[in-house]
Amino acid sequence: MAEEQDLSEVELSPVGSEEPRCLSPGSAPSLGPDGGGGGGGGSGLRASPGPGELGKVKKEQQDGEADDDKFPVCIREAVSQVLSGYDWTLVPMPVRVNGASKSKPHVKRPMNAFMVWAQAARRKLADQYPHLHNAELSKTLGKLWRLLNESDKRPFIEEAERLRMQHKKDHPDYKYQPRRRKNGKAAQGESECPGGEAEQGGAAAIQAHYKSAHLDHRHPGEGSPMSDGNPEHPSGQSHGPPTPPTTPKTELQSGKADPKRDGRSMGEGGKPHIDFGNVDIGEISHEVMSNMETFDVAELDQYLPPNGHPGHVGSYSAAGYGLGSALAVASGHSAWISKPPGVALPTVSPPGVDAKAQVKTETAGPQGPSHYSDQPSTSQIAYTSLSLPHYGSAFPSISRPQFDYSDHQPSGPYYGHSGQTSGLYSAFSYMGPSQRPLYTAISDPSPSGPQSHSPTHWEQPVYTTLSRP
């Protein structure tokens, strides 16, 4: 019990009070009788080594008491002479910072019963079996402690209680302050992206119909139908998840980058006006087009201008939410257009002989039959935007009242529905795949040269200039 008391006092004594006693000038063996704490500290306390010089001093002290025959006498005397001539008060003490008090040395907690047992047993075992690894020794000591019964533990418990009372006397204002664990987890308070980011033209405020479409405006004009009035591809989409473009641009020919149409103005009610003029239709992924059945007409009608003149509607609403024919080509099926019930579909069967189908699209607007932006008829294919109310698809066509639809329409039937019963917008439908071949070769009725019927080999198409109303 006396040995345990000595050990515990050494463990409890603060570093400041321990060092001058251990490092007093003189030979190392003279440190032993200098109090119980010093003797205990010198007898092999391996658990708390100091910095380099202090460790040497403790080692010398340990050698002086325990194994005198390890070093010759001349070596021990030389070491003692060197150590006695050095002022050890100049050596900075190892101070563990406790809170903000950097000047005061760290006060250790009083040992509990297991610590009393483990320290005494560790010293005894380390002297007897120096080859034992410290970690294995600790494990074994813990196992042995759990196997002890209450009568075996009682002396250690009493000693721990005595140490606790002594610690309370020595440090009356002591308060246990455990070191705060550094929180390695990343801060989770990262702010979510705002609903309509202007840089991406996002429309997350428009709820699940758009599935928070983040359409990149940082690549404008790459085959864009509305950026500089070149509707090379039918205009963009109405919604889609923020996936990167996966469809290869097979129909892209010569899109000029013209970032003068930046649709970054937020609409009223927190719903941004998405300018899809800078969105290439060929970049829409397959999942977007296969999930287009959940389509709310009332959400989209707010973007239409009040007048039904398709010259304006084609330039605005077709740019706002258009579904082009290349969209269904990329999708591969026509299941993404759902037919709303109770809407009359004026089906215009193509008149004409030997594959010259001229589909005439009529508009019952308040101004009468609307006049699309006419332009001089040339031998190349020109395009205007036939504005559908829901999908606003800018179908490539000849810009005349009689529209010759070119030969790259997809096989799926198109249903363009009038969302309002007043019939402000044009409504038309194509024949199903059972009524017409996959690609109908349509030639321009005007005198023209030979045209190629592949959309990747158009020769210098003539474009209608589309402008905002």
Swiss-Prot record:
Q: Which GO terms describe its biological process?
A: central nervous system myelination; enteric nervous system development; morphogenesis of an epithelium; negative regulation of transcription by RNA polymerase II; neural crest cell migration; oligodendrocyte development; oligodendrocyte differentiation; peripheral nervous system development
Which stretches of sequence are listed as region Transactivation domain (TAC)? 356-469
- The answer to keyword Disulfide bond applying to this record is no
Q: What gene name is given for the protein in this entry?
A: SOX10
User: Locations of Polar residues compositional bias?
Assistant: 443-469
Q: What is this protein called?
A: Transcription factor SOX-10
> Mind telling me which SUPFAM superfamilies this protein's record contains?
HMG-box
Q: Where is this region: Dimerization (DIM)?
A: 65-105
Gene3D superfamilies, alphabetized:
High mobility group box domain
| SMART domains noted in UniProt | HMG
Q: Where in the cell is it found?
A: Cytoplasm; Nucleus; Mitochondrion outer membrane
Segment Disordered: which positions? 1-70, 163-203, 215-278, 357-378, 436-469
Query: Subunit info?
Result: Monomer. Interacts with ARMCX3 at the mitochondrial outer membrane surface. Interacts with PAX3.
PROSITE patterns reported for this sequence = HMG_BOX_2
Q: Which GO terms describe its molecular function?
A: DNA binding; DNA-binding transcription activator activity; DNA-binding transcription factor activity; DNA-binding transcription factor activity, RNA polymerase II-specific; RNA polymerase II cis-regulatory region sequence-specific DNA binding; transcription cis-regulatory region binding
Q: Enumerate composition-biased segments (Basic and acidic residues).
A: 163-176, 257-274
InterPro entries reported for this sequence: HMG_box_dom, HMG_box_dom_sf, Sox_N, SOX_TF
Query: Biased-composition ranges for Gly residues?
Result: 33-44
Give UniProt keywords alphabetically: Activator, Cytoplasm, DNA-binding, Membrane, Mitochondrion, Mitochondrion outer membrane, Nucleus, Phosphoprotein, Transcription, Transcription regulation
Please give the function described in this protein's UniProt entry: Transcription factor that plays a central role in developing and mature glia. Specifically activates expression of myelin genes, during oligodendrocyte (OL) maturation, such as DUSP15 and MYRF, thereby playing a central role in oligodendrocyte maturation and CNS myelination. Once induced, MYRF cooperates with SOX10 to implement the myelination program. Transcriptional activator of MITF, acting synergistically with PAX3. Transcriptional activator of MBP, via binding to the gene promoter.
Q: Which GO terms describe its cellular component?
A: mitochondrial outer membrane; nucleus
Q: Where is the composition biased (Low complexity)?
A: 23-32
Q: What is known of its domains?
A: The transactivation domains TAM and TAC (for transactivation domain in the middle and at the C-terminus, respectively) are required to contact transcriptional coactivators and basal transcriptional machinery components and thereby induce gene transactivation.
DNA-binding region range list: 107-175
